[in-house]
Amino acid sequence: MAGIVSLVILAVALFSFMNFDPYVSQVLALKGDADRGRAIFQANCAVCHGIQADGYIGPSLWGVSQRRSQSHIIHQVVSGQTPPMPQFEPNPQEMADLLNYLKTL
């Protein structure tokens, strides 16, 4: 039981941290443009995730916005903590555009 409680506390803390990160807050405050996001995806992500985002080296991203929170997606893109995915450093507007594009998948 103590293990479950600890796990829940850790999950809440991580979720809170990701939502209060200044970069994440900046991104989430912006209105993204799906067309610009698609161009960003094609230039940076399609090599691994496929031209249609249906997976290649990396997983399919269809429905990712329904499976993951926007904060989680932002963290995934900028952290590079899931090899072989590299760390990316999009500016806040580019990240907002990419998020908006991913919502269309």
UniProtKB/Swiss-Prot annotation:
Q: Which GO MF terms does the UniProt record name? A: electron transfer activity; heme binding; metal ion binding
Quote the SUPFAM superfamilies the UniProt record gives. Cytochrome c
Top-level taxon: Bacteria
Which residues are recorded as binding heme c? Answer: 45, 48-49, 85
- Enumerate the InterPro entries for this protein: Cyt_c-like_dom, Cyt_c-like_dom_sf, Cytochrome_c550/c551-like
Cite the entry's keywords alphabetically: Electron transport, Heme, Iron, Metal-binding, Photosynthesis, Signal, Transport
- Signal sequence span per UniProt? 1-29
Gene3D superfamilies under this entry?
Answer: Cytochrome c-like domain
Q: Name one GO biological process term.
A: photosynthesis
Q: What is this protein called?
A: Cytochrome c-553-like
Q: Which organism is it from?
A: Synechocystis sp. (strain ATCC 27184 / PCC 6803 / Kazusa)
